Curated annotation (Swiss-Prot):
Annotated metabolic or biological route of this protein: Carbohydrate acid metabolism; D-glucarate degradation; 2,5-dioxopentanoate from D-glucarate: step 2/2
Protein EC: 4.2.1.41
Listed Gene3D superfamilies: Aldolase class I (3.20.20.70)
Species in which this protein is naturally found: Cereibacter sphaeroides (strain ATCC 17029 / ATH 2.4.9) (Rhodobacter sphaeroides)
Residue stretches in coiled coil: none
CDD domains xrefs: KDGDH
GO biological process: D-glucarate catabolic process
Protein's name according to its UniProt entry: Probable 5-dehydro-4-deoxyglucarate dehydratase
Length: 301
């Protein structure tokens, strides 16, 4: 898939990022992963992000990532697969090349490791990764890797395969400046934790889609919310926010890392063998899983 094709796919509907299942020995479990990806691909997501943030990219080795991408491609049907990519520049370049060799359709460039960097350094990092692959690249603006509008414009000038921008800062002023400056040069995705909580604000800033974590275990509900959002049906959006997303937010906020662990628990609760989260995260308690189960059961479509 060429960069412009993945750019179009990213903007064509609701997106998600499958959790990465691990077995009893803490190894990637391909068979249950493929079963889950196949199920998700039946709910019309144009793109799934393999080995993304909710897929515990931060806990994966670079060698595991292409194996996950291959497993996703084999089971996703016509759904495009974009892989997580990141760490230091040279590691990220290597991951990008390995994802392309594994048949991936693009990469999501997550923040580099640990250190803060000036805009010129961020520019050099993103440019180097873009130049390592012919695939479309999406940058994830968050934490220690926040590109300003002028830096992003330079990158778009110099990197024709930079086609997407995902925001995890929540800084609506900055993202509106970026969409005003960049226009249709990029596809824009909301990327805050539990993105539905922020979707209406981002829609006002010209972000027409986002990646939904809960799509992993309640895809029909996620699609219902997204359809209402795009139709301007505020009553339906508020009903789902109050009955599902705000209670889920309360559970997710109980402990650091639950933005991932709660999603993985949800996948297990709807019948998939997702396994545990890897350290340094921790799984929900039994009591918390019961709370989540009741929430899911009340919203089965």
């Amino acid at each position: 898939m060429d960069p412009q094709q993945i750019k179009a796919a990213l903007g064509s509907g609701l997106l998600s990022f499958p959790v990465t299942p691990f077995d009893a020995e803490n190894r990637f479990a391909a068979a249950p992963y493929q079963k889950h990806v196949e199920w998700l691909s039946g709910f019309d997501a144009p793109v799934l992000f393999a080995a993304g943030g909710t897929g515990e990219f931060f806990s994966l080795t670079p060698d595991e990532i292409p194996a996950i991408v291959r497993a996703a491609k084999e089971s996703a049907g016509k759904t495009a697969i974009v892989s997580g990519c990141g760490y230091g520049t040279e590691i990220a370049r290597g991951i990008a090349r390995s994802v392309e060799a594994a048949g991936g359709d693009g990469i999501l460039l997550l923040p580099h490791y640990l250190i803060d960097a000036p805009q010129e350094g961020l520019y050099a990092h993103v440019k180097a990764v873009c130049q390592a692959t012919g695939m479309g690249v999406m940058v994830y603006n968050r934490d220690n890797a926040v590109l300003q509008a002028d830096t992003l414009a330079r990158l778009c000038d110099d990197c024709p395969n930079l086609v997407g921008f995902k925001d995890g800062t929540g800084d609506i002023g900055l993202v509106r400046q970026i969409t005003a400056k960049m226009g249709d040069r990029l596809t824009y995705l909301g990327g805050m934790p539990t993105a539905e909580l922020f979707a209406e604000a981002y829609l006002g800033a010209s972000f027409t889609t986002y990646s939904s974590a809960v799509f992993n275990f309640v895809p029909a509900l996620a699609n219902k919310f997204y359809a209402a959002l795009r139709a301007g049906d505020r009553a339906t959006c508020e009903s789902i926010l109050n009955s599902f997303f705000y209670p889920f937010m309360e559970l997710r906020s109980r402990r650091k890392g639950y933005a991932v662990a709660a999603v993985k628990a949800g996948v297990r609760l709807v019948g998939f063998d997702a396994g545990p989260v890897r350290a340094p995260l921790s799984d929900l308690t039994g009591e918390e899983e019961e709370i989540l189960k009741a929430l899911i059961d009340a919203h089965r479509e």
